[in-house]
């Protein structure tokens, strides 16, 4: 309490000053960034994905976040920019052979080495514990250290050989300046994709609205519906049918009665080589002929029926 004798109070005990900003433990922050999911705060487990800003997530947590359509869903800063599963890239990580995991400290009587990491750079061998800068390629998902990217300059991936550009390199858990640069790139990339999608839609609509020119153009039909032999037979039959008509017209115009052409003579179906079932369809067949006694008295017939 003070001021009751025997105590000498100090100034900071009596006068309230500005509160000191609590410093975050750097080691604890690095462990949280590189070992835990940014969205669900659970330990990272395969499959591990990364967004366009370089943050690490569990793929299951991202899928659950996208499927959750409830109004109570908290849209935090960690996942507000993720609109679909295409906005994240599945990472291809290289395991650290020296990593023991939780097996080395099952009893809890050993010190946890925070410098030890689960994954390493496949090119240089640096551990991915936050002490070294790591990046991944958006085109293939391979992860390696920034030192490997600077020391071995190439236009293809160091692990899988896929070609990449400068915009495909995304820094994992970068600084504030790195996040700002990645955010501008992300916005430009999405705007470019929207413009390309809009330009593709009118082209598709024009192709549907405009029919083919070959369909509207007048001309002889090029469609063949049968064999060439059948087409030649049809043309011959048409010629034979047109020939008697032309001769009949010439005779009527000249006023001379001539003999009917040989093709115009009547031919009985009984003389043909067709089957009896086919011949029975005509009135000239024997089954169609009836005597006067068998035929009804009220039915009238013309001369050509029998």
Swiss-Prot record:
Keywords for this protein: Chromosome, Phosphoprotein
Entry annotated with the keyword Cell cycle: no
BP term (GO), one: cellular response to hydroxyurea
Keyword Phosphoprotein assigned: yes
Ranges of compositional bias, category Polar residues: 243-255
PTM description: Undergoes proteasomal degradation, via DDI1 and DDI2. Removal from stalled replisomes and degradation are required for genome stability.
One Pfam family of this chain: Rtf2
Compartments reported by the entry: Chromosome
A GO term for molecular function: DNA binding
Source organism, top-level taxon: Eukaryota
Amino acid composition bias (Basic and acidic residues), ranges on this chain: 226-240
Chain intervals for the UniProt region annotation (Disordered): 193-276
Phosphoserine: modified positions: 287
Main subcellular location: nucleus
Entry's Gene Ontology cellular component terms: nucleus; replication fork
Stated role: Replication termination factor which is a component of the elongating replisome. Required for ATR pathway signaling upon DNA damage and has a positive activity during DNA replication. Might function to facilitate fork pausing at replication fork barriers like the rDNA. May be globally required to stimulate ATR signaling after the fork stalls or encounters a lesion. Interacts with nascent DNA.
Oligomeric and partner information: Interacts with DDI2; probably also interacts with DDI1.
Family, as annotated: Belongs to the rtf2 family.
Name of the protein this chain belongs to: Replication termination factor 2
Name of the gene this protein is made from: RTF2
């Amino acid at each position: 309490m003070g001021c009751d004798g025997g105590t000498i109070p100090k100034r900071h005990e009596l006068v309230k000053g500005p509160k000191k900003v609590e410093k975050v433990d750097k080691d604890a922050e690095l462990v949280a960034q590189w070992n835990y999911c940014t969205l669900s705060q659970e330990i990272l487990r395969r499959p591990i994905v990364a967004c366009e800003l370089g943050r690490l997530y569990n793929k299951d947590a991202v899928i659950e976040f996208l499927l959750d359509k409830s109004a109570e869903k908290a849209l935090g800063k960690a996942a507000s920019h993720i609109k679909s599963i295409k906005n994240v890239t599945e990472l291809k990580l290289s395991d650290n052979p020296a990593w023991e995991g939780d097996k080395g400290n099952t009893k809890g009587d050993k010190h946890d080495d925070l410098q030890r990491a689960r994954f390493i750079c496949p090119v240089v061998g640096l551990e991915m514990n936050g002490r070294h800068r790591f990046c991944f390629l958006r085109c293939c998902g391979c992860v390696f250290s920034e030192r490997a990217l600077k020391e071995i300059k190439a236009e293809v991936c160091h692990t899988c050989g896929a070609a990449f550009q400068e915009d495909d390199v995304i820094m994992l858990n970068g600084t504030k300046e790195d996040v700002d640069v990645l955010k501008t790139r992300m916005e430009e990339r999405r705007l470019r994709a929207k413009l390309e999608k809009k330009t593709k839609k009118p082209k598709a609509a024009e192709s549907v609205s405009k029919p083919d020119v070959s369909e509207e153009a007048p001309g002889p039909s090029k469609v063949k519906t049968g064999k060439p032999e059948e087409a030649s037979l049809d043309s011959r039959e048409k010629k034979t049918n047109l020939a008697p008509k032309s001769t009949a017209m010439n005779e009527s115009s000249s006023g001379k009665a001539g003999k009917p052409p040989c093709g115009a003579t009547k031919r009985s179906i009984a003389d043909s080589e067709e089957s009896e079932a086919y011949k029975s369809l005509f009135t000239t067949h024997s089954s169609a002929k009836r005597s006067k006694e068998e035929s009804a008295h009220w039915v009238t017939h013309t001369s050509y029926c029998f």
